[in-house]
Amino acid sequence: MARITVEDCQERVDNRFLLVQMAIKRVHQYREGYEPLVESRNKEVVTALREIAAGKVLPDDDALYTPPAEQAAAVNEG
């Protein structure tokens, strides 16, 4: 599987500090029993970053989220 980078995640969430908070929150959720939203055999933090990059995990404030291009086009059309 390809490597995940902060830049991949910043396509969805601009703020690096928010990105770190989201990843930490997601890791805590895994430890509470939540299931990952993407298939991954990586460590928890890498799985959390993969979820963020895939747009599966959103910040609490939707204004801070940049949807994938195809999703944004569908919203603008509808």
Curated annotation (Swiss-Prot):
Top-level taxonomic group: Bacteria
Keywords assigned: DNA-directed RNA polymerase, Nucleotidyltransferase, Transcription, Transferase
Assembly and oligomerization: The RNAP catalytic core consists of 2 alpha, 1 beta, 1 beta' and 1 omega subunit. When a sigma factor is associated with the core the holoenzyme is formed, which can initiate transcription.
Top EC group: transferase
InterPro entries per record: DNA-dir_RNA_pol_omega, Pol_omega/Rpo6/RPB6, RPB6/omega-like_sf
Reactions it catalyzes: RNA(n) + a ribonucleoside 5'-triphosphate = RNA(n+1) + diphosphate
Pfam families with a match to the protein in the record: RNA_pol_Rpb6
Function in brief: Promotes RNA polymerase assembly. Latches the N- and C-terminal regions of the beta' subunit thereby facilitating its interaction with the beta and alpha subunits.
A GO BP annotation: DNA-templated transcription
The keyword Transferase is annotated on this UniProt entry: yes
GO function term, MF aspect, one: DNA-directed RNA polymerase activity
Protein's recorded name: DNA-directed RNA polymerase subunit omega
